[in-house]
A protein has these predicted regions:
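C-terminal regulatory/interaction module of P-loop NTP-utilizing enzymes
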Residues: 1-170
Length: 170
């Protein structure tokens, strides 16, 4: 909803407050039943207070390592488990960093598909470097990873995966 213009936001306020819409050529149309409306926001701009007052909020955090593994397994079923583990561990590590835009699950899936199409069996530094654009959308974020050294970031992701595996095994 935050990507819509102010006219559409005003339209939503009318729908959510009065359960009706006014169309100049037709008139006012009222809902026979109270509608169930789901709005999503990426927080690209601030919404008006009038609209926020009419909404309940559910913040959805990034998935856990295990949940992301399940998602990759269902969306990219041909991915080998070890590659999927490496990808998910790498993504979990990236999300712990201070980036302009942290990668979401869509980027995880896109990256897994890209790596598979390249025939990758594991996260090789050269392949990771050439595919960072799949997961990080800003040049400054890509440069942060490159400055840290991709082999070192891969190693940190491996240590994170191992720590997560030990914790879930308990």
């Amino acid at each position: 909803v935050d990507r819509s213009d102010e006219e559409f936001e005003a339209f939503l306020v009318e729908v959510l407050s009065d359960f009706q819409i006014t169309i100049p050529e037709i008139g006012t149309v009222k809902a026979k039943k109270v509608p169930f409306v789901v709005l999503t926001s990426n927080r690209t701009r601030e919404l008006h207070d009038a609209l926020k007052r009419r909404c309940l909020y559910l913040w959805i955090d990034y998935p856990t390592f295990e949940k992301e593994m399940d998602i990759v397994g269902s969306r990219v079923p041909d991915a080998q488990e070890e590659l999927a583990r490496q990808i998910c561990g790498f993504m979990q590590l990236l999300r712990s960093r201070d980036f302009y835009k942290k990668p979401g699950v869509a980027e995880t899936i896109d990256w897994a598909l890209a790596l598979m199409s390249m025939g990758s069996k594991d996260l090789d530094p050269a392949v990771v470097d050439s595919t960072l654009g799949c997961i990080l959308k800003y040049k400054e974020d890509i440069e942060k990873i490159q400055e840290d050294g991709i082999p070192q970031v891969i190693e940190k992701a491996k240590m994170l995966r191992e720590r997560i595996s030990r914790q879930t095994a308990k």
